[in-house]
Structures are given as C-alpha cells and as structure tokens.
Amino acid sequence: MAKEKPILNVAFIGHVDAGKSTTVGRLLLDGGAIDPQLIVRLRKEAEEKGKAGFEFAYVMDGLKEERERGVTIDVAHKKFPTAKYEVTIVDCPGHRDFIKNMITGASQADAAILVVNVDDAKSGIQPQTREHVFLSRTLGISQLAVAINKMDTVNFSEADYNEMKKMLGDQLLKMVGFNPDNITFVPVASLHGDNVFKKSDKTPWYNGPTLAEVIDAFQPPEKPTTLPLRLPIQDVYSITGVGTVPVGRVETGIIRPGDKVIFEPAGAVGEIKTVEMHHEQLPSAEPGDNIGFNVRGVGKKDIKRGDVLGHTTNPPTVAADFTAQIVVLQHPSVMTVGYTPVFHAHTAQIACTFMELQKKLNPATGEVLEENPDFLKAGDAAIVKLMPTKPLVIESVKEIPQLGRFAIRDMGMTVAAGMAIQVTAKNK
C-alpha cells in the first residue's frame, strides 16, 4: 500500500460574506472530493430558495438550518487531496456568536487561509476579519495566506486587487505580527474557479500560484512527540465487558499500552490497557490522534471531561494561579480586578478570577503602555494574573504550547483570548 500523504489541517477564516464556504466548496469540487452531480442538485436547491450561487457553500453548510440562513455554524471538516497533502479543511464560522467555535476550530489548524472580498477595499476591513486574524495569531497559527475573492465583481482589476492587498498589509497583518512580505496573496473568483485549483486566463497580470499551490507550499506540522504526554479528556464511557473508556485527542507526547498514567486535577492513577482509534487497537498513539483507551484502576466516576491525562513521571500541571497574556476582543464595559468569567482551556471550562492587572500592552508590538492599569477594555492587550475558582490544568506556552492557550467567555460571547506565560503549580 502506498504511503498516505501527510495530513495538513487548514482553517478558512474571514468575514461571513467574503465567500469562504464557496472557496472551500470549489477546492473540494476541483480537488475531486465531491461528486459533480451533487453540485448540480445543490444548484437546483439553491435556485429554488432564491440563493443562486450558494451551491458550493451548501457542501460545507451541511446543517439544514445553516442552509436556510446561509451561515456556517458548526466547524465542518472536509478533506481533499492536493499534489502534496491530504488537506483537512476547518471551515470556521464567520458570525460573531460563533467565535467560540472559531477558537476551538482554529486551534486544530496548521495553517490558515484568510478569505476577503476585494470590494472591502472601499468599505474598509470588516471587524470580524480583524478578529479572526488576531485570534488565529493568538492561537498559534504562524502560516497564513490570503485569498482576495470575488475578483469577477471588479472585472479582475489589478488596481483593485493591489489596493486590497496594501490595505490588508498596512491595517491588519502588520498590526498582529504577520509580515505581509512573507504572505502569499491570490486573486480568486471562487464561484467560477479562477485561480483556486486552475490558473485563470482572466488575470494575465498575476503570475503567482493558485490557491491549491499555496496550500502545498505550507510546511507540515512537526508532531510534538518529544513533549510530555498531555491528553485532555472529551468524554468518559463505561463499556460493558471492557470497563472505563475515556476518549480525547493526544495533544503532545506518546501514549502506549502499559503506561502508568495520572488524570489531573482528578488525581486518579491507573495503567493503560489498550489504545484504539476507529475501532482498531494501536501499539501507540501520537499527537493529533483522536483515541479511546481503557485504563485499569480508574472508574467512570473518578474522571470527567476537562481532566488531562499525563504520565505519572510527569503529571499535568494543576494551577494555583497563572500569569497570562490576553487580548480583550469585546466587552460591553471594562474588566477590573475581581472579574471572574469562564475560561475555556482545552476541554475544560472553569471560572477564573482576575487577581492583578499587571501591564497594558500595545497589541501590535507587545511594548508596555501602562503598568498596573485600573481596567481593561475592548481592544486592549495585557499581562494579568489569574486564579482558577476550581482546579484547572494549564501549562505555560513556553513548555507545552498546546495546553497554554485559552478563550474567555462571558455573557454568551468570547470576551478575550490568551495564553499562559507562567504557571504556579498547586502543592499536592
């Protein structure tokens, strides 16, 4: 059997009207991942509902409710092959109320494609676009490319393309720490397929790669197999005749049958009996693998979602308190000492209290603007000291970046995102 192509997870980010789902649908179709008959059927359905042109988007928007609203809600995963990779697309939602999904979606991505509407050069960069790029950066995505879409609406004008490209570079990418010179921009018309998989004859002034070629130029992720084992628990099942079976995704390290393990903050200790993926037993599992495993000596009631598994020789860190760098995305008022919103870190959701506001930073450069500010508001970046109200596993991003990032939610929205830069471990 031929060696399978490496998998690359690519997040598609950007404003809801930029044509992300259509871009993704076009990649899937031209990449041979969709039966063309399906597109014909969806086109008919789209026309009947008065949404002609939405047929590619329908491929990603599998949920019926989304189809009627024309909005992508859950994070949809679809695959297509390029010359080099088996690409898994993480189609991140665009609407504000789905930013939480964006956070859980983007953190699984190795690279991101920002899709923008060329017409935004006239109206300015959409706030959502800023937020998505900023979040992607905060969540550790360092590889980014930009698809400037809907080029057909400006007659494939090079001037409009260059104006949009300059605006994105000056007003967005530089601000969040991406160097525009290292980012590939592609003029596309996803609805018609121009420069997505196939070179377009309508952009003779553009001699760069197609979007599919840009994806092939991304670097594959290095699996963090040498870091300590960390596996956040998503669910715990009790299976008759087998016993307790926790499931989750290996974030770092390697897990094997026979390993002595500990779940934190639960403190439950056991031994791995078997490791399974897709109903097959494995001799070991590594980062990125979604697995179920059977543990000797641990009952279903001993552990829960949000616990993190590690080896007994290097247990996950339970934080007494931690210092973090955060970015306030949106907040109706201000954040002060004593504020206690819910932190979403890996699979855990725990309220944490702001103990100290140590420094306010320039979000674009990281330089200190103010020591010990009285409050933080939307748009601020800061260094803060936090204390979990219940036991929480979190690691410093310097040591185990996969377990150092978090989102802060309050009032039904994501108010901030950040990363732990120093963690004080709880004494046992």
UniProtKB/Swiss-Prot annotation:
GTP binds at residues 14-21, 91-95, 149-152. It catalyses: GTP + H2O = GDP + phosphate + H(+). PROSITE patterns: G_TR_1 (PS00301), G_TR_2 (PS51722). GO terms for molecular function: GTP binding; GTPase activity; translation elongation factor activity. Mg(2+) binds at S21. Residues 5-225 form the tr-type G domain. It is an enzyme of class 3 (hydrolase). CDD domains: EF1_alpha, EF1_alpha_II, EF1_alpha_III. Keywords: Cytoplasm, Elongation factor, GTP-binding, Hydrolase, Magnesium, Metal-binding, Nucleotide-binding, Protein biosynthesis. It is found in: Cytoplasm. Residues 91-94 are annotated as: G3. Residues 149-152 are annotated as: G4. GTP hydrolase that promotes the GTP-dependent binding of aminoacyl-tRNA to the A-site of ribosomes during protein biosynthesis. This is Elongation factor 1-alpha.
